[in-house]
From Swiss-Prot:
This is Acireductone dioxygenase. Catalyzes 2 different reactions between oxygen and the acireductone 1,2-dihydroxy-3-keto-5-methylthiopentene (DHK-MTPene) depending upon the metal bound in the active site. Fe-containing acireductone dioxygenase (Fe-ARD) produces formate and 2-keto-4-methylthiobutyrate (KMTB), the alpha-ketoacid precursor of methionine in the methionine recycle pathway. Ni-containing acireductone dioxygenase (Ni-ARD) produces methylthiopropionate, carbon monoxide and formate, and does not lie on the methionine recycle pathway. It comes from Klebsiella pneumoniae subsp. pneumoniae (strain ATCC 700721 / MGH 78578). Ni(2+) binds at residues 97, 99, 103, 141. The gene is mtnD. The record marks 102 as: May play a role in transmitting local conformational changes.
Length: 180
């Protein structure tokens, strides 16, 4: 179940607000300029689908976003617990960073935790299958896939080069709860 937990940057262990209600999550995030919607990830992808299979199954969703915002490229990130690079990838994504473009993800399988550092607050958004999130350009954030990752998400970009991060050097992420 999708969830949003809100923290103050002054107390990273005590939640200020928490909800699993999609409308409440959407309202909180929309107020900060973050798009959050529940879409339908209802296509049968089979076991370990190829990126091409995922793209073909959800081309209609990609086309909708391209028509709305003019995105130029997309790909699929899919990580499982047996991935030999899971620890290195987790550490990379756990470092606070920004992008020069919106970070758009549509989760079609599994879950991951987006943590958004907005002003003096941290919004931990547990995204699961059916969730679309768009983090605005230049928003400091990090992503936790957990120690045993299990997710597939379509990534959509303004930049044809794909995922390009500017790391902030702030170790704020280490103070907040992580996925198991």
């Amino acid at each position: 179940m999708s969830a949003l937990t809100l923290f103050s940057v002054t107390d990273p262990q005590t939640p200020v607000w928490h909800s699993t209600d999609a409308k409440a999550i959407q309202a909180q995030l929309n107020a900060k300029g973050v798009r959050f919607e529940r879409w339908q990830a209802d296509r049968d992808l089979g076991a370990n689908p190829s990126p091409e299979t995922v793209i073909a199954a959800y081309q209609h969703a990609i086309d909708k976003l391209v028509a709305e915002k003019g995105y130029q490229s997309w790909d699929v990130i899919s990580l499982r617990a047996d991935n030999p690079q899971k620890e290195a990838l987790r550490e990379k994504f756990l470092n606070e960073h920004t992008h020069g473009e919106d970070e758009v993800r549509f989760f079609v399988e599994g879950a991951g935790l987006f943590c958004l550092h907005i002003g003096d607050e941290v919004f931990q958004v547990l995204c699961e299958k059916n969730d679309l999130i768009s983090v605005p350009a230049h928003t400091p954030h990090w992503f936790d896939m957990g120690s045993e990752p299990n997710f597939t998400a379509i990534r959509i970009f303004d930049n044809p080069e794909g995922w390009i991060a500017q790391f902030t050097g702030d170790d704020i992420a280490s103070a907040y709860p992580r996925l198991a």
